[in-house]
């Protein structure tokens, strides 16, 4: 079996991919095509090596991440590779949230350089022993993918570092982006080799694989796909600087569920989708959802937890108790503050040390009684920034120790080595306060670990001679900019840049009364112990299952090329309107009602010229000339404009301002059900709208005879939407006793009389036709926007109208392939005019003319021919 990956980004768009050598595996391959799911042939050389050979009823989760939850080392005697589970890996720990019947398949890279000649053997061993499928990236690609794009571009940007610093020069390197895309493609190939798309759930982790969902969704339109981002997501002003911003957003939107640690991260993501892709979101029954081409992409907000059992087992080790006694003796009579951080520019270690220096300056009584133990984990990245951060950390610690230290006393102790787990746990358990001062961090589980270690275990209590009923306390000083901060309501939150405030917070934590310390600890322990990693994983998967329930109730097909690919999901009955079918019905009916929207239906929405061209007028005149037809243009535009533009069509009916004004032909007078006295509400609405217009730059007010409309499409997207919501609430309150309705639409808030809509206008026309003894036996309605959905709903309800002698043939058609109440669609205005031209030709006696025109349209006639 051969895996395929991109050589460059242009190749990606054409899907002309280079070959990479890959492990031979006897695994089945399945795929879906639009509307159909089928299984392709896949050889089974050995059932024992088949990941899919387990009981088909057994739940299976495919976990995809950059690194597998494995530790690898080569046996020095045999030269063979040996593997074991990495017990500290979140990917392994999340299994606690599921039953023992759940099968897990892991896909990712190894933290070891496996030679090409050994890759097949290693792959087979990992599949048999661990249910793991390794991805082997070529060395150059791995460096460009991980150290290049992930650590050089995404990681700094997601932590709010803009690519505008002089020492970085031209920060964006497209070759690194191409490697990122190619690596994600290789990951997708591994998933495709093992997945059963009808049954399996795929859970992708973190920013390394943000375009992987696009590759998987392209191959399996109905794949059950979740993604969790373990880093921060920056504000739209930061994120929009990324040249490939849209591709990454679309990648995530090809998932069914996207998870974030905090609402702030989710809010920034939603803002980016709104500002850059024009997408709206709404909350239904507590779940946030984005409508994306007929699919609802749900947003999950839940911080990850820790593995309680793993930490408690370390607390019970004799080596941990021995280290705790050593720490107790070494720092007897002193208060311990603990910091545990990676050595990088975002963990704020130097700011923490400066705050400690300020503490000793301000609170002189703390001198000689306080020790900061700072454990420095090895840096995950390399570079000039990391070296400068390390240099500053050591110089600051040295300065503090020289100024405030003494013989046998160091106020700052840096432990810059690989610290064993038992030793780190002992420091957690003995520290009086934990200080986490990161300037930006996705989650940071250090506070959670500290809380659990301070609670202790019966085994630890016995070893340390502590009474089991003794009060437990813990104090946390945490940065406002880390993901766990919102969930720790009892912690003292600080701005890490304000070193004076941090110093004051540490002093407060150390001098706080024991009762309050105990109450804060109990509150934190209850939360952390009930929201562990198992709870987090189970909750995410439950929401993913809920998000995928509608997969097989809709018709799906893919649109777009390369990384712009997305799936359009619509009703199974939704199809392209066949010219042949409607013309046949048209000829066999005697009374027809035809309703047409104006903007976006007869005239392109994007056109600056809004007057109808000669072709539109000719088609309308021809249709209106048939005495069997009642033709109406139903629009939100004013009656004066429509009357002027459509004046050549004398027999054309017009419903202006969404049906507030109706005229049956140019020879008739305009009708309305409302008098000018009933419009007194305008004097109440206009001042309110004007105040919002003045306060919202870019907004305008449209004055109609029947309505007032506040537009905010040219305002800031977020601020405009916020103002629109507030204006809606304000007007609903002011107009509660007035005979009007307040509606919020696409970038508008509109106030109009009750009973005014395109749907009611259509009902009025059909009712009048019935009263005149000419009930329609065919009704056709074509429109393109939200207001036209009222028309579609109205004509579909006419089927059950008891006033009609028999149900008419109904053709509700929207312009553009998008979710709609209509049963049919046409692609664009050009298709609409071709359809109307076909009907006009059928009306005339020149049958050959229609046949000639119809044959030219046959290539895009029936939706079924596409399937």
From Swiss-Prot:
Pfam families: Glyco_transf_20 (PF00982), Trehalose_PPase (PF02358). Residues 59-546 are annotated as: Glycosyltransferase. InterPro entries: Glyco_trans_20, HAD-like_sf, HAD-SF_hydro_IIB, HAD_sf, Trehalose_PPase. Keywords: Glycosyltransferase, Phosphoprotein, Transferase. This is Probable alpha,alpha-trehalose-phosphate synthase [UDP-forming] 9. SUPFAM superfamilies: HAD-like, UDP-Glycosyltransferase/glycogen phosphorylase. The modification Phosphothreonine is found at residue 32. It catalyses: D-glucose 6-phosphate + UDP-alpha-D-glucose = alpha,alpha-trehalose 6-phosphate + UDP + H(+). It is an enzyme of class 2 (transferase). Its EC number is 2.4.1.15. GO terms for molecular function: glycosyltransferase activity. The lineage of its organism: Eukaryota, Viridiplantae, Streptophyta, Embryophyta, Tracheophyta. It comes from Arabidopsis thaliana. The modification Phosphoserine is found at residue 5. Gene3D superfamilies: Glycogen Phosphorylase B, HAD superfamily/HAD-like.
